[in-house]
Curated annotation (Swiss-Prot):
Source lineage: Viruses, Duplodnaviria, Heunggongvirae, Uroviricota, Caudoviricetes
Statement: the UniProt record of this protein carries the keyword Nucleotidyltransferase: yes
GO cellular component, one term: extracellular space
UniProt KW DNA repair keyword: no
Reaction catalysed by this enzyme: diphthamide-[translation elongation factor 2] + NAD(+) = N-(ADP-D-ribosyl)diphthamide-[translation elongation factor 2] + nicotinamide + H(+)
Subunit structure: Homodimer.
Protein name from the UniProt record: Diphtheria toxin
Length: 560
């Protein structure tokens, strides 16, 4: 859900909090006393944008421009949450989502006593009315006044408003008055900026640890979280909608007006914005139109800019798979951070919102491609984009749904940094030489408790004698095969990374299949190979002030 929508929700809740001391009945209508509390050294988490990770650690300051936390004047404030993974979802710059960059997450703490006032409703006017507040002054500004704190603070130094992301959700969002927020101490939790254009990749890995990348939790009940969405149904719905949209008279006419050739970005965006406006009038996009009308980020201009950017990346010969993934998942209309496509879905009809969003996004990208690159078949391009998006979501999240795959290893697992790795069989730990051909070696990987990421694997090679078969090396998560991208990083080492995020733990296992190719029957001696181990890389950690990936080494034998 967007900050603006959160603001509305918080306003409704506040109305119940601000009732005069003599009007507790009204306050009870908007304040949830069972979830309100006073706490010493109250802490929460905040996601910060690229370029601000260092400055925010110096203290919280109200921005001089921009939304200042929310589009709605009543809800302008400093936002934080009790869930650090949810906070990470706000670390991407919405103005430049295709940069691949992300900011970070900080932990913020108030000194002394803080009253957390939990709200029930989302209408600012109602909240102010029920709490006996001024109807003309912004809600969050009144929350920071001495009068408000005296009436509702229960002896605390400040009042922070809270609101659940959705009915049944355990996550909570906090709204802090800007002046009060200056008292917050700031501690860095995680920094994605150090990864440069791979920052969003690191952010996705971090968020998926708790499946919190599904910002849909902010707007719908937990029963409709990303884990439980039926992607097969969404795929069918999306394709049906695309066919209906394509054949709709006004949309068909608008498509015929397309320049259908390479044009300037300005002309491409102008056409796509008009296409967006026309498409939203179709009944198949009625739910999405409602969301668009309440959330500025869904405006046609943003959709158009997003579609052009995605089309440019897809058309680029130099863009690697990660860059294309970043483009597809950029936090803009239609597609968001892992589950951002449903961001702002307030009608508890998430599946429909997702289908409508993907349908419109796919059509707009298909329309944009010939404007910035090659001419393509609109239907084919749209369907291909649908499959790419759905497949990516399934790869990230389906591992948490699929039945556990446990091949039964015959060697003792190596435990380190929360991971457990082992050769699947004793034979897998032996690299035999003296013949030409292929050999495969399986490694079982899991985590002891919390889901942890698999960043890749380092494989020793001998050019011309022992090479990695890149097309056959892959990783399977609970039986689902995921291809890997391999490249030589040194003359005798090859690094392979999954083409999609991979996590293990809590019943989710991975099987890494390493394939070697020998083009010569010449024997290999131990002193010819740079390392007698295969290194599995996990999460990033800091050692002696240097960031490194957790590494688990499995030793092998070379035999003739």
């Amino acid at each position: 859900m967007s900050r603006k929508l959160f603001a509305s929700i918080l306003i409704g809740a506040l109305l119940g909090i601000g009732a005069p001391p003599s009007a507790h009945a009204g306050a009870d209508d908007v304040v949830d006393s069972s979830k309100s509390f006073v706490m010493e050294n109250f802490s929460s988490y905040h996601g910060t944008k690229p370029g601000y990770v260092d400055s925010i650690q110096k203290g919280i300051q109200k921005p001089k421009s921009g939304t200042q936390g929310n589009y709605d004047d009543d809800w302008k404030g400093f936002y934080s949450t009790d869930n650090k993974y949810d906070a990470a979802g706000y670390s991407v710059d919405n103005e430049n989502p295709l940069s691949g960059k992300a900011g970070g997450v900080v932990k913020v703490t108030y000194p002394g006593l803080t009253k957390v006032l939990a709200l029930k409703v989302d209408n600012a006017e109602t909240i102010k009315k029920e709490l006996g507040l001024s109807l003309t002054e912004p809600l969050m500004e009144q929350v920071g006044t001495e009068e408000f704190i005296k009436r509702f603070g229960d002896g605390a130094s400040r009042v922070v408003l809270s609101l659940p992301f959705a009915e049944g959700s355990s996550s909570v969002e906090y709204i802090n008055n800007w002046e009060q927020a200056k008292a917050l101490s700031v501690e860095l939790e995680i920094n994605f900026e150090t990864r440069g254009k791979r920052g969003q990749d690191a952010m996705y890995e971090y968020m998926a640890q708790a499946c919190a990348g599904n910002r849909v939790r902010r707007s719908v009940g937990s029963s409709l979280s990303c884990i439980n969405l039926d992607w097969d149904v969404i795929r069918d719905k999306t394709k049906t909608k695309i066919e209906s949209l394509k054949e709709h008279g006004p949309i068909k006419n608008k498509m015929s007006e397309s320049p259908n050739k390479t044009v300037s970005e300005e002309k491409a965006k102008q056409y796509l914005e008009e296409f967006h406006q026309t498409a939203l009038e179709h009944p198949e996009l009625s739910e999405l139109k409602t969301v668009t009308g309440t959330n500025p980020v869904f405006a046609g201009a943003n959709y158009a800019a997003w579609a052009v950017n995605v089309a440019q990346v897809i058309d680029s010969e130099t863009a690697d798979n990660l860059e294309k993934t970043t483009a597809a998942l950029s936090i803009l209309p239609g597609i968001g951070s892992v589950m951002g496509i449903a961001d702002g879905a307030v009608h508890h009809n998430t599946e429909e919102i997702v289908a409508q969003s993907i349908a419109l996004s796919s059509l707009m990208v298909a329309q944009a491609i010939p404007l910035v690159g090659e001419l393509v078949d609109i239907g084919f391009a749209a369907y291909n984009f649908v499959e790419s998006i759905i497949n990516l979501f399934q790869v990230v999240h389906n591992s948490y749904n699929r039945p556990a795959y446990s091949p039964g290893h015959k060697t003792q697992p190596f435990l380190h940094d929360g991971y457990a790795v082992s050769w699947n069989t004793v034979e897998d730990s032996i690299i035999r030489t003296g013949f030409q051909g292929e050999s495969g070696h399986d490694i079982k990987i899991t985590a002891e408790n919390t889901p942890l990421p698999i960043a890749g694997v380092l494989l020793p090679t001998i050019p011309g004698k022992l090479d990695v078969n890149k097309s056959k090396t892959h990783i399977s998560v609970n039986g689902r095969k995921i291809r890997m991208r391999c490249r030589a990083i040194d003359g005798d080492v090859t690094f392979c990374r999954p083409k999609s995020p991979v996590y293990v733990g809590n019943g989710v296992h991975a099987n890494l299949h390493v394939a070697f190719h020998r083009s010569s029957s010449e024997k290999i001696h131990s002193n010819e190979i740079s390392s007698d181990s295969i290194g599995v890389l996990g999460y990033q950690k800091t050692v002696d002030h240097t960031k490194v990936n957790s590494k688990l080494s499995l030793f092998f034998e070379i035999k003739s």
